């Protein structure tokens, strides 16, 4: 395996990566994003994520959350459709709601799962039942669930996936404290067959190849 190559990206580099759609591009051609999360305790987390997806240029964003969290979503998301799914006794998504979620996310090119979804047993069963049949982004509580049960991720990976841990979540995924951010981000990428975005004062992005 070749040695990892490290690059430092500045504002100009990031700006060059932002796509500029043609004037006649429709919303579906600009990419569709499904956001899954939220619970009775954290109804606002997926709202922030869905808003961010829209602001980043996604043509169509849909939020899938619990029935108890929809009021918060409707109050803050004026142009993003919100789907309500069954919730378990802890006020989180549950295994039966995965079927509803799959139907609502059928047109999504990529799915972000995790913000505010909680770490209850119901949350774990939901994540286990959620199909990983397209590119996926795992964030927040989804990472804690994966650290607790590595079997929640399809292995080998069938589609591209991204993990977005902060150092605490990264430590849980590794099963030890972070010793070297560069090396540990690469280790995570290889262990989980994913692109890893290790957040911090200087965010690191690592792939299994470097």
Regions found by a protein language model. Name each.
Residues 1-135, 144-162, 167, 171-210:
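Small-residue (G/A/S/T)-rich helix-start motifs and N-terminal tracts that mark the onset
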């Amino acid at each position: 395996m070749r040695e990892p190559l490290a690059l430092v990206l500045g504002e100009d580099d990031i700006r060059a990566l932002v796509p500029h759609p043609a004037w006649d591009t429709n919303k579906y051609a600009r990419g569709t994003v499904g956001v899954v999360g939220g619970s009775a305790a954290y109804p606002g987390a997926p709202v922030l994520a869905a808003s961010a997806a829209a602001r980043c240029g996604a043509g169509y964003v849909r939020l899938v959350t619990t029935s108890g969290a929809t009021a918060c979503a409707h109050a803050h998301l004026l142009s993003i459709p919100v789907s309500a799914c069954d919730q378990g006794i802890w006020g989180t998504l549950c295994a039966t709601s995965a079927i509803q979620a799959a139907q609502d996310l059928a047109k999504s090119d990529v799915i972000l799962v995790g913000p505010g979804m909680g770490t209850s047993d119901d949350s774990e069963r939901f994540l286990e039942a959620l199909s990983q049949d397209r590119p996926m982004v795992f964030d927040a509580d989804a990472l804690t669930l994966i650290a607790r049960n590595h079997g929640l991720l399809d292995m080998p990976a069938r589609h591209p996936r991204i993990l977005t841990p902060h150092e605490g979540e990264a430590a849980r995924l590794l099963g030890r404290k972070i010793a070297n951010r560069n090396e540990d981000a690469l280790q995570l990428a290889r262990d989980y067959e994913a692109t890893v975005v290790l957040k911090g004062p200087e965010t690191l992005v690592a792939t299994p190849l470097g």
